[in-house]
Amino acid sequence: MKRISFYLLNFFLLQSVAVELMADIDESDVLQAMAKPGRLLADINRDNRSRPEAISPLQNLELGDSVVDIFAGGGYYSELLASVVGDQGEVFLHNSPGFESWGRNGLYDRFASDRNPGKITRHTQSGINLSLNSESLDGALIVMAIHDLYVIPKRYNGEEYVAVGNSANTGYFLDQVFASLKPGGRFVIVHHQGNPESSIEVITDLHRIDETFVRSEVEAHGFVFVDSSNALRTESDDRDRIVFDEDIQGKTDRFVIAFEKPIN
């Protein structure tokens, strides 16, 4: 009888661990990660304007999951994600060389020898190449960078900025994200809201893009829209202004939308 009780106890303990591993990461988990000692001061100062506790739950992640933070720059979200998925999971901090350079100060501080940012794999690839294994990820995130896929590269000729090339192959990029996700995996996009039907020129100049346009582009590549958040909405934002204007920087109207790779 004692042996049976011992086996039953072990069974229920294992079941309890399994349930814990399968529990969705929610707002309280993200808030706990945000409250951890040793976070970078720059990250703490960003928390109020980025509201990760309202964004990350849309990813529908679980402890032990693998996720990619696309064009992550200095890795603000990467470290938070590493904290919530735990050492059983993995976070890919993905950058192109340009985004790597833009985020170099944050990356230097984040990966300093005297701190542990969690289980993060730095993943720098050329251009819009993601180079991720097929159906290897439970989630993907891109924050304030989706518009860069549409940007027309320009160069100053001494009088004005003139186009020197074409925008990226957005379809190729989205197909890569789709292929990297497991069925049921989510792709979350956060960006500055632009005016409807904005031209590529306006998207390039203002660093804004329309939510409806982005949604139609993503859905055209197999994703299904599943959720959104109004946590970063600001109706008073002037969408005709560049997002870097000092008095609106960090306070723009931002959309948050979540897509899923269909299971069947």
State where each predicted segment sits.
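A short glycine-rich, Lys/Arg-flanked "PGG" loop and its adjoining helix->strand segment in the class I
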Residues: 82-83, 156-183
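Conserved class I S-adenosyl-L-methionine
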Residues: 64-73
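Core SAM-dependent methyltransferase catalytic element
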Residues: 221, 238-264
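Class I SAM-dependent methyltransferase Rossmann-like catalytic core
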Residues: 30-62
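Short glycine-dipeptide loop
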Residues: 64, 87-88, 181-187
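A short acidic, Gly/Pro-enriched loop at the edge of an enzyme's catalytic core
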Residues: 131-140, 144
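Glycine-rich SAM-binding Motif I of class I
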Residues: 75-79
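S-adenosyl-L-methionine
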Residues: 103-130
